[in-house]
Amino acid sequence: MTLQSFGVIGLAVMGENIALNVERNGFPIAVYNRSREKTDAFMAYRAQGRNVKAAFSLEQFVASLERPRKILVMVQAGKPVDAVIQQLKPLLQEGDIIIDGGNSWFEDTERRTQELEPTGLRYIGMGVSGGEEGALNGPSLMPGGTKSSYEYLSPIFNKIAAQVDDGPCVTYIGPGGSGHYVKMVHNGIEYGDMQLIAEAYDLLKNVAGLNAAQLHEVFSQWNTTDELNSFLIEITANIFPYVDPETKIPLVDLIVDAAGQKGTGRWTVQTALELGVAIPTITAAVNARILSSIRDERIAASKIITGPNAKYGGDIGAFVNMVRDALYCSKICSYAQGMALLSTASKTYNWELNLGEMARIWKGGCIIRAGFLNKIKKAFDENPALPNLLLAPEFKQTILDRQAAWREVIVTAAKLGIPVPAFSASLDYFDSYRRDRLPQNLTQAQRDYFGAHTYKRTDKEGTFHTEWVPIAEAKK
């Protein structure tokens, strides 16, 4: 019996597409799905005429694979992954490799790696970005685990990943759960990107008064620039011309303004808090989705609470350009926060992440792919120990040149009652990061006053506590 090179468990659309991608690149595939009907449908249509072998039990599936077996699990994160692993364990042999390609919590990946190690089974936690289209035609892959396991899988990964000017969009991330952690932060950055674009759209539509055709033109032009050329700007431009065939109204205007989320943005915020890394733009993006979801409450509030009534009286063309500058400055800050989180996680968990390589593999295939990532890669290649992207000469100069427009846009939004939480959070991050003295000296004095938490001084070494109450009483 001829054995297959690679196996995929889970035939939802991502599993189907990545299986077809692997087969198209010359690796015979075996597939298994819990539901036989799903497997039958896949084999009858999309896999017809391909070198794909269907299995209808895990025993049959495992027996159809050459050793060491390479099995990609594409099922829902959490307990379903654990269930598949438990079912596979008695069927596999030492040296076989299980790859989790879902959006698993990185600590689950660490736990599974440790649990499988005594059995001799190898485990790879791999972030996969690019959605359905990327899975089929070339995603960005973020595999974490042992280096030897990655090297064994790299001939396949290098073929199926998106291809850019400097190679395939895959690299060895690091040990344990690092691959899933990097994918989580990628998704957090994606949240920030999408919220910043939404705020730019809101300003252009409701301050500048642009219609759908004009919005399409502006975003299309922005997508031709070095700084904003990206997949998300491209699809944003493509959304505006689509007219609902029934109402003849731009479809975007008919979509309910309540954004969903699957949890990776929230995870990013949670881990940042645990590691003590400020990511206010990404946090604002998560909060914006939460606020959008209480739509009925917002609609009721809009009839009770009033805001400014003023209209924008400035030059529309100049305002559009200022919004572009504000969007780019905010984007730099959002990515600076994401990279700072990766840097801290790398040090905390001893992952030795190469941040320049992270930027490189995000250049193609993934949702945040953008020309701007070349600049990030260059910054970290020139200085791998760079503490923050805001300190990179190019980004520093860009913000210095454009900060007046950035500030003007946020002031205008505030005057007109247009919420721009991610724009504002980005500017606050920039202003806080560049200050040599923040007002937290008062915060520390307050903590010492009510809780004797002590404080340090700028003029002498040591830790100090003051009996504030007697001093205050004496002043009365």
Task: List each model region and its residues.
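Interdomain hinge/lid region at the active-site interface
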Residues: 180, 205, 225, 230-332, ...
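Rossmann-fold dinucleotide-binding core
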Residues: 6, 81-84, 99, 105-216, ...
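Short beta-strand "acidic-cap" motif of Rossmann-like dinucleotide-binding folds
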Residues: 29-31, 125, 276
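NAD(P)+-binding Rossmann beta1-loop-alpha1 motif at the extreme N-terminus of oxidoreductases
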Residues: 1-69, 92-95, 132-135
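Glycine-rich, highly charged phosphate/nucleotide-binding loops
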Residues: 53-60, 77-85
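Small-residue-rich helix-loop
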Residues: 222, 347-380
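C-terminal amphipathic alpha-helical interaction region
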Residues: 400, 405-476
